[in-house]
A protein has these predicted regions:
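ATP-binding N-terminal substructure of ATP-dependent carboxylate-amine bond-forming enzymes
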Residues: 1-96
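Short catalytic-loop micro-motif centered on adjacent basic/acidic residues
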Residues: 4-5, 66-69, 119, 153, ...
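Phosphate-binding site of ATP-dependent enzymes
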Residues: 157-195
């Protein structure tokens, strides 16, 4: 059995180790030749991991049985799309990957299904009249980044403006979400998939 792992950061290091313990051959793709997980897989490709055609070609050439990543929701889009294109098994469909990796889509699904969520605005540009409808502190996020990249808590208008501009640069689509801060406990869950 052969697995393609996309992205070579700290979370993927453990994934690669787990796959190797299960005697699964591993192929790692990452845009950084010196990524942290570089030494672990059986084979490594330096490639733009968001280029669907390049990822697909490597998956076909390597005859992988499945494609996987962890802790990277934007990369999950690539995993799901290429898996669907090639008819490979995947733990998430492309539409579901879109729903969880786009914060605006996710918020809309929450509202449609009456799942409590914070008050928010989707902003194409910085509109202080719209923002005045929300209560500080505010959380500013790129709509489509991952690993808390660009997520900042703004206590003042000055911080909000700076964080908005930062989030807009980080967002691949240029979209930014601003939402009211909610004090609470964050819970993370790690699972092992049975292969």
């Amino acid at each position: 059995m052969k697995a393609m792992v996309i992205a070579g950061g700290v979370p993927q290091m453990e994934l690669l180790r787990q796959l190797k313990e299960r005697k699964i051959e591993t192929v790692l793709l990452d845009g950084n030749e010196n990524c942290l997980a570089r030494a672990i897989p059986d084979k490594f490709y330096k490639v733009n991991i968001f280029n669907i055609e390049d990822v697909k070609k490597i998956a076909v050439d390597e005859k992988v049985d499945f494609i996987i990543t962890v802790c990277a929701d934007q990369v999950l889009l690539v995993v799901a799309e290429v898996s669907e294109m090639l008819g490979l098994p995947c733990y998430i469909g492309y539409k579901q990957a879109q729903d969880v990796s786009d914060k605006i889509r996710m918020k809309k699904i929450f509202k449609e299904n009456k799942i409590p969520t914070t008050k928010y605005l989707e902003l194409e540009s910085l509109d202080m009249n719209e923002i005045a409808k929300l209560n500080y502190p505010l959380v500013v996020k790129p709509v489509d980044a991952y690993s808390s990249k660009g997520v900042r808590k703004a206590e003042t208008e000055k911080e909000l403006i700076a964080y908005y501009n930062e989030a807009k640069k980080i967002s691949r689509s240029g979209g930014v979400i601003v939402e009211e801060f909610f004090e609470g406990e964050e819970i993370s869950l790690t699972t092992n998939l049975p292969f």
